[in-house]
Every structure is written in C-alpha cells, then in structure tokens.
Design a protein with these regions (language model features):
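Structural recognition of the beta-strand scaffold that forms the well-ordered cores
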Residues: 63-67, 72, 105-110, 135-141, ...
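Post-signal peptide N-terminal segment of secreted/secretory-pathway proteins
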Residues: 89, 95, 103-105, 136-141, ...
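Solvent-exposed loop/turn segments at secondary-structure junctions
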Residues: 70-73, 111-116, 142-148, 177-181, ...
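Soluble non-cytosolic domains of exported or imported proteins
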Residues: 62, 78-83, 113-117, 121, ...
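Contiguous mid-protein beta-loop-alpha structural module that forms a pocket-lining wall or clamp
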Residues: 161, 165-257
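Alpha-helical scaffolding within the catalytic cores
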Residues: 44-53, 89, 116-130, 152-161, ...
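Oxyanion-hole/transition-state-stabilizing segment in secreted/luminal serine hydrolases
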Residues: 65-67, 72-73, 99, 116-152
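N-terminal secretory targeting modules
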Residues: 1-67, 72-79, 90, 94-103, ...
Length: 411
C-alpha cells in the first residue's frame, strides 16, 4: 500500500509540475492556454490553410516563408534559429508532416529594421527567388511600420503578391508586441478585407504584464525583441491558430477581392538592379559607380541582402555627376543606406529630383545609422508616366559618400 501511495504521489507531483511548467513562462497551464487563445483575433477563412495541411500530411512539397523585421529574423535569443519563425517551422513539421518532414521547406525572409514598404521591393527576390512561391507565408511588420497610409498600402501589396502568385497560399498576419505598441489597428482592416487568419501579441502581453502574470524581462530582451520564451509564446500562438483552422468546419474557398482595400496601390513592385536588364529603365550612374560592401546583412547567411548597389565614390576630384534614371512608372521607391556611426568613411546628404523638381534631401550620414536601409516613396501616382530621376550630392557633401541600396517601381 505504501508503495502504491508513493507511486500515486509521484504521479500527482509530475502532473502538477506539468500543469505549472509545461509552457515557457512556467505559469498555470490553463492560464497560459487562455492567453494563447486570446491572441487569435480572427480565424479568417480556413480553406487555404486546410489545403496546405492536407499537402503536408500527404507528403507533398510545401514551401513556407516568413517575411518581417528583426523579430521574424530571430533577434532576441542567443541563437537566431530560436526565433518564432524557425520554431514554427519545426513545430508544424513535427505535428503534421510524415516521417522527418523533409517535404516541408522554409525560407526566413526577415530583415532587421525593415517594414512593409521595403518588403514590397524585397518580396520577389528574397521570398520567391531565394525560396519559392510560398504555400504558407507569415507577414510580420506591425512593430516596424509607423502606421501611416503608405505602410497600410504596402502591407496590402504584400498580401496581394502572395495571393496573386498562388491563390491557395495561406497568408497569416502576425502582429508582434513592443513596449511602444504596434500597428495592428491599421493592418487588421486590410487582413479582414482578405479574410486572413490573424494573431495579435500586443494586448495579451500588455495585459499579462499589467497583471504580473510574468515579468517584462520574461518576454522582452529590450523594447521590442522577445526572449527565447517570448518567441516560444509567439510560436505557440501561431500553432494554436493553425490547430483551430485545422479542426474547424471547412469554409468555402475565398476569392481574391476584385478591388483593393486602399488606393492608390503599391502592388506589383519590380526591383531594379545595377546589372539592369529591364528595358523600361535606363540608368547613367554618374559618380555612383562603386559597390558598397557594408550594406545590411542577413542573420541566416551573414552576407549582405543587397550585394548589388550604387555607392557614390568618395573622391575630392569628383565632379558631382548625378545618378540619372529614366523610366515609366506609377510608384518609385528609393532605398538609401544610413552609414554606421563612427565609420571611417563619411557619408553626406543627397538631393533627389524628379522631372527637374527637387522632391527630397536625404542624409546618409545622420547620427544613429547602422548600415540600415532607409526606404522612401519618391513617386506616387495613379497612372504610369515617364519620369527622369536625378540623385546628386547636396552642397557641402560633394566629397562625401552616399549609397543607393536599391530601387523599386510599379507600372
């Protein structure tokens, strides 16, 4: 009897321990599951996700992508591969794929400090060409975007790109948390318009911190990047969403809306490369004839995400020859580099002219730079027209550097 009671006592102890600590924050499991459930703000239409899961279970090739900023790239934990996106990839393979899950492929297209606008320029190359046309994609820019109309339009363009290339692509909208908030208020109407499943971390994290469910240090490493436990929480929320979609009664397939949620649209962005093969684009590089080897790097490769670019030659004898581009477009995005503070090469200001009119001056050497990307929409029209764009160093910066990281346009 004593042995039986001892065994029973050990069993009860283990059950209680599992209830208290089977989650990253070591809190009551029921409370944790309620937190997870609260992050699911909309299940959207489940038809696309059900098809993806059916393909995974059948052993068919399935391509998963994640597009976002530093949280998606894996910032926070000691190892970036402990980020939520990598955890999600491992979890969905383990739960739904046969065998070792080798039929499921993953491409993490996260890049620190970047938002939806640059995402439109990166999408075709960094998501599709580096990986493949996704069957499932997570889009996460809620703590990087500033919430203005341009970011809302860019977010919609990314959703549209994924669905147009593959109408059966399951797009998941993920809104990360930060101590300064997020832009889920601007993104949720777009996601609702496309019937997307959505997870919002912010309200639940804020509520949990307010009620001392866990400490700030348990979730955040700083003001935005989660701890490994925070990333695990995000993964659990995404997996709970997938499980809910899997178990629910099948919805009728959702058609891609004929119109757009917000116009003018930024959909259909084409990236321009220095080895330009686009007959619509004519470029004279002027003094921007060098290649910058210090542009932003990807954690997954430790190499530049923009190895091809246009760097202004630092030369006291430079004649300040402008970068000149002629093209037909509706929208044009210019991305320049914020030179790392303290770098021996000093960067300066460049003026941007469109059809002879100065539209902006950008400072590539402003304080706080870390070789980061600075995207700006410099042409924004409803109808395509022919334009001439000039970029040249501003007075006083003729001897300094400036890097055009990349360009993107729509027709």
């Amino acid at each position: 009897m004593k042995i039986k009671n001892a065994i029973l006592g050990v069993g009860l102890f283990l059950m209680c321990a599992a209830t208290l600590s089977a989650n990253p924050f070591k809190i009551n499991e029921n409370d944790y599951q309620q937190m997870v459930e609260k992050t699911i703000v909309n299940t959207g239409n489940n038809a696309r996700m059900k098809k993806v899961l059916a393909k995974i279970r059948a052993g068919e090739k399935v391509y998963i992508a994640a597009l976002g900023g530093s949280v998606t790239e894996g910032a926070g934990p000691a190892k970036f591969t402990d980020g939520y996106a990598y955890q999600f990839f491992r979890a969905i393979k383990a739960k739904y794929a046969p065998g070792d899950g080798k039929n499921v492929y993953f491409n993490n297209a996260g890049l620190s400090g970047t938002g939806s606008l640059l995402g439109t320029v990166r999408y075709q190359h960094d998501v599709v060409e580096v990986g493949n046309t996704p069957d499932l994609i997570i889009i996460e820019f809620a703590v990087n975007d500033n919430g203005d109309g341009i970011c809302q339009r860019a977010f919609e363009a990314l959703v549209r790109e994924a669905l147009t290339a593959n109408p059966e692509c399951a797009v998941l909208a993920l809104y990360s948390a930060a101590t300064y908030g997020n832009t889920s208020v601007q993104k949720r109407p777009v996601a609702d318009f496309y019937s997307l499943p959505q997870v919002n971390m912010l309200d639940v994290v804020n509520e949990s911190l307010k009620n001392n469910v866990f400490k700030k240090e348990a979730y955040y490493t700083d003001i935005v990047h989660p701890t490994i436990e925070g990333h695990e929480f995000m993964c659990d929320c995404l997996m709970a969403l997938v499980d809910k979609l899997d178990k629910a009664k099948a919805d009728s397939p959702a058609a891609i809306p004929e119109g757009f949620f917000k116009e003018p649209v930024l959909y259909g962005m084409k990236r321009i490369f220095p080895d330009n093969k686009d007959s619509n684009v004519k470029i004279e590089v002027g003094d921007f004839k060098e290649t910058d080897r210090k542009c932003q790097t990807l954690k997954k490769t430790n190499t530049s995400d923009f190895p091809q670019n246009w760097k202004k030659k630092l030369d006291a004898k430079a004649e300040n020859l402008p970068f000149k581009m002629e093209l037909t477009c509706k929208n044009l995005i210019l991305v320049y580099k914020g030179q790392a503070s303290g770098d021996a090469e000093k960067f300066g200001k460049a003026e941007v002219y469109v059809d002879g009119r100065k539209v902006a001056t950008y400072d590539g050497g402003k304080e706080g730079g870390w070789n980061n990307c600075e995207p700006h929409l410099i042409i924004d029209e409803r109808k395509a027209a022919k334009h001439t764009v000039l970029i040249k160093m501003a007075p006083g910066s003729e001897k300094l550097g400036f890097t055009i990281v990349t360009l993107g346009y729509t027709l």
